[in-house]
C-alpha cells in the first residue's frame, strides 16, 4: 500500500522557519526535515501545551482534533481500513493492525511508531481533512545547537584525558 505524500516539493527543497535562538515553527504548507529536533509546544486554537516528544505531541493533537471533528476522523479511519491510505488510524477492533497503537479517545487509535516527519505530515493530513486553518495549529520545536555539539565532540572525556596524561608521563619517563 503506497502512502500519499502531502509535500509539494521534494524533502530537500523544503524550508523550515527558523529563528536565531535554535527554535523553529513547522510550516504545514511546506514541511522540511525534522532531524535532530525536539518539540517544545503545541498550540491548537486557544489551547497551548508544552511538549517533550514528537509522539506525545502527535497524540495530543489527534486527541484535540478528534474532539472537534469526529465525523472527519470517522472518514479518515474508513479510508485507512479500505486500503486507500497507509494504516495510521483505526478503531478498537482493528488496533492490532498497528505496530504501536496509541489511544486518542472515542475508540480511535493512531500509529505511534513513526518519525517526526511522518507525525508532522499526518498532522497536516488532519488539518487539511478537517479544514483547520494552518494558523490555528502551531508546533514549535528546538533544533540541535551546532556550536554546542561541535564543542562537545571536540572536548575529551575524563577517561580519554587520563589516558593522554598517562602517555605523556610515559614518554617523558623514558
Where are these predicted regions, by residue range?
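Short, low-complexity, charged amphipathic interaction modules
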Residues: 1-13
Amino acid at each position: 500500500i503506497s502512502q500519499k505524500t502531502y509535500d509539494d516539493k521534494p524533502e530537500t527543497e523544503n524550508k523550515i522557519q527558523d529563528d536565531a535562538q535554535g527554535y523553529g515553527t513547522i510550516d504545514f504548507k511546506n514541511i522540511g526535515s525534522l532531524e535532530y529536533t525536539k518539540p517544545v509546544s503545541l498550540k491548537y486554537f486557544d489551547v497551548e501545551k508544552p511538549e517533550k516528544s514528537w509522539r506525545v505531541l502527535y497524540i495530543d493533537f489527534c486527541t484535540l482534533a478528534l474532539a472537534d471533528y469526529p465525523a472527519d476522523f470517522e472518514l479518515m479511519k474508513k479510508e485507512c481500513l479500505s486500503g486507500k491510505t497507509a494504516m495510521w488510524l483505526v478503531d478498537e477492533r482493528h488496533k492490532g493492525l498497528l505496530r504501536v497503537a496509541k489511544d486518542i479517545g472515542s475508540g480511535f487509535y493512531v500509529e505511534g511508531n513513526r518519525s517526526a516527519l511522518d507525525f508532522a505530515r499526518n498532522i497536516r493530513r488532519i488539518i487539511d481533512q478537517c479544514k483547520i486553518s494552518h494558523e490555528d495549529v502551531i508546533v514549535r520545536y528546538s533544533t540541535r545547537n551546532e556550536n554546542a555539539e561541535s564543542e562537545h565532540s571536540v572536548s575529551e572525556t575524563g577517561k580519554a584525558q587520563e589516558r593522554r596524561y598517562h602517555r605523556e608521563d610515559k614518554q617523558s619517563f623514558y
